[in-house]
Regions:
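Vicinal oxygen chelate
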Residues: 1-3, 53, 59-61, 95-152, ...
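N-terminal beta-strand motif that seeds the catalytic metal site of vicinal oxygen chelate
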Residues: 1-23, 84-89, 138-170, 176, ...
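An N-terminus-focused feature that recognizes amino-terminal "leader" regions
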Residues: 2-13, 20-54, 61-69
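Amphipathic alpha-helical segments
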Residues: 18-33, 95-104, 165-181, 246-253
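Short secondary-structure junctions
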Residues: 30-41, 104-113, 177-188, 252-262
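Intrinsic, low-complexity N-terminal interaction/targeting segments
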Residues: 37-41, 50, 62-64, 72-74, ...
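Ordered, small/hydrophobic-rich secondary-structure cores
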Residues: 39-108
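Aromatic-anchored, glycine/proline-accented short structural segments
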Residues: 159-206
């Protein structure tokens, strides 16, 4: 990537039928802090509402279509169900990013420029291992949104992508994103043994990649996910201080909790089922 291009991971966007209902659910169990009020946006892909929240040092964005005006959010939900829609990365200069992607045969969609000097473009999930990725050129790149002071309640650790070929996926992100820092090399999961995982820091944020191991294994959840949905974003992962209290509230409220266990290293975790969490599989680890 051009040395003059700088990037910063900004948020993961979640497509929902109702922002208010989704925010009510996530706020009940996780320490969300509003970054932006619910706002209407008009882009080349259509008009919609969005709202941002801080969670453990990272940002969740919720998006919905305008009432009675089905658009790209509704089309996404009709095809995939509610859930993670795209990853968003801020850049100081968009044009060289798009030029390199197109030169290498990547599919770039929904380009748009705004009077403010901002601009946006997306890498089609067909080119980026099932993940729709937004680049957002911001004129005030050197003056990012101030983060709230750490509250010690949560740490947003990573987004996990299910892929067929983990090395090809990691090579792709290393080629088109910056800065990139190596993380854990692909290896058989020590805690489970039924999937391969690796991670890397991409534009200041950790991405995890998971892949089925060679041969047939019991409980190959990665293969099942890809068979049903295709490659793409699998889950979000966070460390939570009030692990026990949150788990108790979820169960008391009848929210489906799955894969609750302690791994071989003594680390406790559970997942909030996407059936109750607006299509998002949420992994929760004990402690910060």
């Amino acid at each position: 990537m051009d040395d003059k291009v700088r990037m910063r991971f900004d948020h993961v966007s979640i497509a929902v039928r109702s922002i208010d209902r989704a925010v009510e659910f996530f706020s009940r169990y996780l320490p969300l802090k509003e970054r932006n009020p619910k706002t209407r946006d008009d882009q080349v892909s259509g008009s919609f509402y969005w709202q941002d929240f801080w969670l453990g040092g990272f940002v969740l964005e919720f998006i919905e279509d305008l009432p009675g005006q089905p658009g790209f959010v509704t089309r996404f939900i009709e095809k995939h169900g509610e859930g993670m829609h795209h990853l968003s990365i801020e850049v100081n200069h968009l044009e060289p990013v798009v030029e390199k992607l197109r030169r290498d045969g990547m599919r770039v969609v929904d380009e748009q420029k705004f009077p403010s000097g901002s601009a946006t473009a997306f890498i089609s999930p067909r080119s980026s291992f099932g993940a729709l990725i937004q680049f957002w050129q911001v004129p005030d790149f050197d003056n990012p949104h101030p983060k709230p002071a750490p509250d010690g309640l949560a740490h947003f650790d990573h987004v996990s992508l299910a892929v067929k070929d983990i090395r090809r996926a990691m090579d792709f992100f290393g080629r088109y994103f910056s800065p990139v820092a190596p993380g854990r090399e692909p290896h058989l999961s020590h805690s489970e043994g039924n999937f391969i995982l690796g991670n890397m820091q991409v534009a200041g944020f950790k991405l995890e990649f998971i892949q089925s191991p060679p041969g047939e294994v019991e409980n190959d959840f990665v293969a099942r996910f890809i068979q049903r949905y295709g490659e793409g974003m699998h889950h979000i992962s966070l460390d939570l201080k009030d692990f026990d209290g949150t788990l108790e509230r979820l169960k008391r409220d009848g929210v489906r909790v799955v894969d609750e266990k302690t791994n071989r290293r003594g680390e406790r975790q559970f997942f909030i089922s996407p059936r109750d969490a607006f299509g998002v599989l949420v992994q929760v680890w004990d402690g910060l």
